[in-house]
Amino acid sequence: MKPYCILSFLILLISQCRPKEQNYITQFPGKPETPSSIKREHEQLLEHVQAFTLFQDSAGLVAIKLHEIMEHHFQEEEDYVLPPLGLLPLLAGGQLPENSREIIGLTDKLQSQLSHLNAEHQLIKAHMDEMLKTSAAFNHPEIKEFEKQLLQHAKVEEEIYFPAALVIGENLKVKTQSKHE
């Protein structure tokens, strides 16, 4: 619980250190949204893969399939995995979102789809490995650098984002249950 509190405090603190118009953390009373920083990271990763699809060799062909898989995977994450993370500033401020039941539904779906999401990470890694093998023959060193970024992104999701979203759901279950008692 302590790391969760520290993480929430840091996010809240950082979000309030800028002028309001430069505040990149979505603070909302209603529907949760994927934090803009994570959404932007997804966009950047997809832009890199999109650039690789322009290669006129087998690495480009693998990149096309990788782009399709990543686009689908990121959409799933932005639909039900990452929106609860947008609630961290609200929860850190001691507030309970109005639509707690909806958010609990998202985190329950995450719990049921966790092995599927991790399997998709493995599928993405397999395509990345294939692209690395094919790119070696065509001298595309930028693919190796991209692989590091992509693996780090997946690691952060598996070690931080997925568990944090689940903790948010469990926290809301406890708070909404005690509110109704």
Label each residue range with its predicted role.
Residues 4-12:
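Sec-dependent N-terminal signal peptides
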Residues 13-181:
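Small-residue-biased structural context
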